[in-house]
Amino acid sequence: MDPANRPLRVVTIGTGISGILMAYQIQKQCPNVEHVLYEKNADVGGTWLENRYPMAGCDVPSHAYTYPFAPNPDWPRYFSYAPDIWNYLDRVCKVFDLRRYMVFHTEVVGCYWNEDRGEWTVRLRQHVGGSEPRDFEDHCHILVHASGVFNNPQWPQIPGLHDRFQGRVIHTARWPDDYQESQWKHDRVAVIGSGASSIQTVPGMQPTVKHLDVFVRTGVWFGVLAGNTGSQTKEYTSTDKDEFRRNPAALVAHAKAIEDQVNGMWGAFYTGSKGQAMGSAFFRQRTANLIKDERLREGLDPSFAFGCRRITPGDPYMEAIQKENVDVHFTPVVSCTEKGVVGGDGVEREVDTIVCATGFDSSYRPRFPIVGRDGVDLREKWKECPNSYLGLAVPEMPNFFTFIGPTWPIQNGSVIGPLQAVSKYVVQWIKKAQNENLRSFVPRQDRTDQFNDHVQEWVKHTVWKDNCRSCTFLSRRPRLT
């Protein structure tokens, strides 16, 4: 048999933006490959299906958050909200008929490498309707982990939050359908956190909520891109969209111009650079121009370098926190009482609802066992100091790839380019395994160590060496991952 025609089976975990991309790439480029994607949710979308808190959206301009093979002239806004992005992903799946490879309502409970067979055994649990869950197994030659890092909510460790407080407790990543404007308009709400989800939730609730208490521990760099300022994201007109449809070159030029602006900030992320000094001065002054209250300006002023944490568009947030029905407290919440929250300042503030805008567990560790060669469990391997080869492969995990792994090359800007690079790399290995009849392949530990040593040396010259509570974080050892 011609090795190029060797049949392979690939299992991808997740049908978010990475899984959909993988489905498209394998369909287009990999003949004689059987591909199945397992998804715990009822449909595609991942983050953009699950996150529906007020004003949930992308902090990258819409036309820079688009697959290269599926430009979208119909983006409604410069920065799109979660439903807009889900509609785009849904359309991509329909146009390219990608759902035929996907199995929904099915969670992965464990993955185990079989050395003798050169295959992964994938254990699954399917939930359909009100029936009992069905457990079953699948097998594959290549396993692709595409479940991302923004799907496992990180709850704050606050005494009394879940067992003493008598009101409603919400995490932004699991926003309930029955808590909308008609419910919160009579509520006093505490919002904990100052990351992206808080920066979007606060202006989403402020106009109609009775009162907001916003608790901030960490300062914020508020960003802006030319062409979109003010309290609302710019909307594309019907004329804009008609022009993009008639003139694809104009659509591509618009997308490239946006990407040039986003990527043009790269020089500012080197410590001591002219770009860092100019960027810091510009955005600090812009924030000062928009926030008139000196206490708010000082409390939100970051103690870390511009770019260390992901830069977030924040004009609506800066406007909202200056309204009469909002109080900002620059203190952590240290405990909860039956009626409210107690800050580090010792003051109890009575509230009806607590919103935890505290992000996700971004430790890279999978939620289920992934057990590779010699019984090595990836959860344990990444417990102390996660590392990988190129952010996508791991020693002792044969025939395994992951999207958005440790030392993955993105902190600010769009993820689409790096995701595209990972998907193409996986396709190259699928073809190599077919053409050379490879039973297994895995990165060497010494080469992985060399790569990670290079990363740590490079990071010393950038803003990411700062301690800024970023999702690109310092592990328990002093290494950035």
UniProtKB/Swiss-Prot annotation:
Site residues by UniProt (Transition state stabilizer): R310
Enzyme class: oxidoreductase
Cofactor(s) this protein requires: FAD
One MF term in the entry's GO annotations: flavin adenine dinucleotide binding
Record keywords, A-Z: FAD, Flavoprotein, Monooxygenase, NADP, Oxidoreductase
Gene Ontology BP terms: aflatoxin biosynthetic process
Amino acids binding FAD: T47, W48, L49, E50, D59, V60, Y65
Positions bound to NADP(+): G57, C58, D59, S194, G195, A196, S197, S198, I199, Q200, R217, T218
Gene3D superfamilies: FAD/NAD(P)-binding domain (3.50.50.60)
Cofactor notes: Binds 1 FAD per subunit.
Enzyme Commission code: 1.14.13.-
Source domain of life: Eukaryota
InterPro entries: FAD-bind_Monooxygenase_sf, FAD/NAD-bd_sf, Flavin_mOase-like
Pathway where this protein functions: Mycotoxin biosynthesis; aflatoxin biosynthesis
Pfam family, one: FMO-like
Purpose: FAD-binding monooxygenase; part of the gene cluster that mediates the biosynthesis of aflatoxins, a group of polyketide-derived furanocoumarins, and part of the most toxic and carcinogenic compounds among the known mycotoxins. The four major aflatoxins produced by A.parasiticus are aflatoxin B1 (AFB1), aflatoxin B2 (AFB2), aflatoxin G1 (AFG1) and aflatoxin G2 (AFG2). The role of the FAD-binding monooxygenase aflW in aflatoxin biosynthesis has still to be characterized.
Family: Belongs to the FAD-binding monooxygenase family.
Protein name: FAD-binding monooxygenase aflW
